[in-house]
């Protein structure tokens, strides 16, 4: 049986996954492959909201590798707040307007799936795992992304997050 701490950390993996999904750029509206502009290093910060109503600052760094005619993506992302830190790996594919993929976090033996659709510079995405489901709203303008995450699970330790990412130079 999972402890509350382990469950909270697994849910945080969903928040990290949201950061990754947030970098899917504005290329959809222009008919370009969504991963086209992702290759490279990204970083950002924001806040997470805990179930007790408190907020913590969070910082993240991500590395993106775009593969196979820019329709596949490999990701490694590291994030840390006062009470969380983790190293997430993920893979995604873009086909016929849909983004699908998988993620894993080996230190906590956690894994799950992602799915979503793009509408211009706005994305509505769902991340799932055995211990959580999270709704994600993503907006991209140029080299900046804003991410709003809301857990769909009432018992989660992390209720949501608001994060901004920017591509490194």
Please tell me what each predicted stretch does.
Residues 2-14:
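Bacterial N-terminal signal peptides that target proteins for export
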Residues 31-139, 150-169:
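Central antiparallel beta-sheet cores of small beta-barrel/beta-sandwich binding domains
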Residues 24-29:
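Sec/Tat signal peptide C-region and signal peptidase I cleavage site
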Residues 145-148:
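Preference for long, well-ordered alpha-helical segments
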Residues 13-23:
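Bacterial N-terminal signal peptides
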């Amino acid at each position: 049986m999972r402890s509350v701490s382990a469950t909270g950390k697994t849910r945080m993996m969903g928040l990290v996954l949201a950061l990754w999904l947030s970098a899917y750029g504005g290329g959809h509206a222009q008919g370009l492959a969504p991963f086209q502009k992702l290759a490279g290093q990204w970083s950002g910060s924001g806040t997470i909201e805990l179930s007790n109503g408190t907020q913590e600052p969070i910082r993240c760094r991500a590395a993106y590798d775009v593969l196979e005619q820019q329709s596949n993506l490999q990701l490694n992302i590291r994030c840390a707040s006062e009470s969380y830190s983790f190293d997430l790996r993920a893979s995604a594919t873009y086909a016929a307007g849909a983004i699908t993929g998988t993620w894993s976090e080996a230190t906590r033996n956690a894994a799950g799936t992602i799915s979503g659709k793009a509408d211009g510079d706005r994305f509505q995405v769902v991340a799932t795992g055995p211990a959580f489901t999270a709704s994600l709203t993503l907006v991209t303008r140029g080299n900046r992304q804003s991410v709003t995450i809301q857990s769909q699970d009432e018992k989660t330790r992390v209720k949501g997050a608001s994060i901004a990412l920017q591509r490194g130079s």
